Amino acid sequence: RSDLQRACYAEPLLRRFPGCLVGNYGTNPHDGFRYWYDYFETEQTSYPGLQEGRALYRHWANEFETTGYTFAMPVLYTWSRMWRWYDFEDPDYRWFRPMLLEGSSCARNTPPGLPIVAFVHWHTTVPPTPPDPAMKQFTVEGYQEFLWHMLLRGVSAFYLWCPAPEYAEEVKALYPVWAAAQEYGEFLSKGRPVAFDVPERPGTVISGLRLKNRVLVRRTDFGSAAGEVVLTVSGQELRVPVAKGRCQVLELK
């Protein structure tokens, strides 16, 4: 499949348009696992992978390396099946954890300089039929926090997919984050990610981009805030206080 994508898609485009960006849905560097299932796939206990509660994170081939693609394109959707994988009381974290696992897997393993353009979607993707009254939509606030963490873990841009009836609400959820992020353009274009941890249970999530001795940080607390958190970045301390709903630029000491 990788050879086919290179020979029939990437190479012809790059010959005609040298230096162009070429990529494809769901094809990206990763940590050896895939943390989501597409709409046409079924979950089987026989799949080789990593079991976590009701979630089975499948082993996934390194198909990106030989495609010749010039950007990575992870899929960060609110797939409805994710909801039942976990028993977290905080409904937002049922979406946040698997999406952050997938996004962080790509960001951590993508070489510096290779853009990451992430497919995103806020509305519940492929909702169950009949509807599950217990399933809670990812809140706009939770989704926007997720987008911030993706930017501060190295995502270069977002590619919004949605059915036509969802256009207005999807753009209203995504655009404010993208617009606000432009204030930190130098960090986004030149900074290097400092954190990729994804808590197993609802707690404190921290992401950041380092530029010299400064770090642009986003901290999101699921549950009660735990006070100041200390990270070690290249042997230096980074103290991250609670800052609900906003970014911070902190100095390494």
Predicted features by range, described:
Residues R1-K253:
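Glycan-processing catalytic domains of CAZymes
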